Amino acid sequence: MTVYFIGAGPGDPELITVKGQRLIKNSPVILYAGSLVPREILDVAEGHAEKIIDTASIDLDEIMVHIEAAHAEGKDVARVHSGDPSVYGAIGEQIRRLEQQGIDYEVIPGVTATSASAAWLGKE
């Protein structure tokens, strides 16, 4: 069982990485911040995921309850964040809790809004 912190990119569902999209599609449990991550990014999981949970209105303790339940059942978790989860993300506090409990995790980078905006400007 692994928790995958997946960067969803700058908001355009077509800008998520191939690896991020594959992990979302294949993870039985998906936790995403609905206030920041467009629901369309999770469309690839429809019909595959057992649970898709919007974490925008719940706190870290509640998020951890969902992760711990998945861990107890041996199910991978896609924890989807906006942009790149390591840049202005809130994964540090989650990672500390996972490490305390011996739960494996992996960080999957996403396209940051900074990188995307440079491309959208069309300038060098």
Model-identified regions with their sequence ranges:
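Class I S-adenosyl-L-methionine
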Residues: 1-116
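Anionic-ligand binding region
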Residues: 119-124
